[in-house]
Amino acid sequence: MPILVVNVDHVATLRQQRLGIEPDPVTAAHMAELAGARGIIVHLREDRRHIQDRDVSLLRQTLKTRLHLEMAATEEMQGIALAEKPHMVCLVPEKREELTTEGGLVVAGRVDFLQAYVKPFHEIGIATSLFIEADPDQIRAAARVGVTHVELHTGHFADAPDAAERKRQRDAIVAGIGLARTLGLKVNLGHGLNYDNIFDFEAVPGICEFSIGHSIVSRAVLTGFGPAVRDMVDIINRFPG
């Protein structure tokens, strides 16, 4: 059965609008755990636009479940991750001008670099993942890197302008899940998933985790963080294993 990992970046986005201390993404993460989330994910960006270094430290010290750290493949971020020791590191592309991560990491052509980059994490027991498109070339390259997981980008599916394109994107993701599994990779899905479109993956085997943030934070503004997380947990818990 897939599990829910909650991204609390946008709680930090709201906090940073006033450069204040609230709302606190660490508190939100604890509430998510109490509501049934099986892990927390944060993206420590190079420009520190939402999550801050202190947030990562506090989350690592206080979470009862798991911390997944999204980050760019830079020397600075590698040092932070090796010091904090999250349960998983997920490498993502990063552009300063983007509002949110716009697409998957290009792995093909960078296999040697990424192999060397993730090696120190494996040596101390940190799981590794690459946020990639559901493209066969990228999935095969990810397998050559030797990561334990891939997270397939669902943003193009979520943003599809019509039913035909949405089906095309879903079919590509489902095929990508199958290919990744045959290559020995564990598969997570994330980006743009919400309380409605997640049902398109209800009967798809082989999904380990759904990484969901924005839609949960959006609902939480109206219903509270605990109920918003619980609603998503209840949906995912109905999915077959």
From Swiss-Prot:
SUPFAM superfamilies assigned to the protein according to its UniProt record, in alphabetical order: Pyridoxine 5'-phosphate synthase (SSF63892)
InterPro entries per UniProt: Aldolase_TIM, PyrdxlP_synth_PdxJ, Pyridoxine-5'_phos_synth
Residues marked Transition state stabilizer (site): 151
UniProt EC number: 2.6.99.2
Disulfide bonds: none
GO molecular function annotation: pyridoxine 5'-phosphate synthase activity
Summary of subunit composition and partner proteins: Homooctamer; tetramer of dimers.
Protein name per Swiss-Prot or TrEMBL: Pyridoxine 5'-phosphate synthase
Organism: Nitratidesulfovibrio vulgaris (strain ATCC 29579 / DSM 644 / CCUG 34227 / NCIMB 8303 / VKM B-1760 / Hildenborough)
Designated gene of the protein: pdxJ
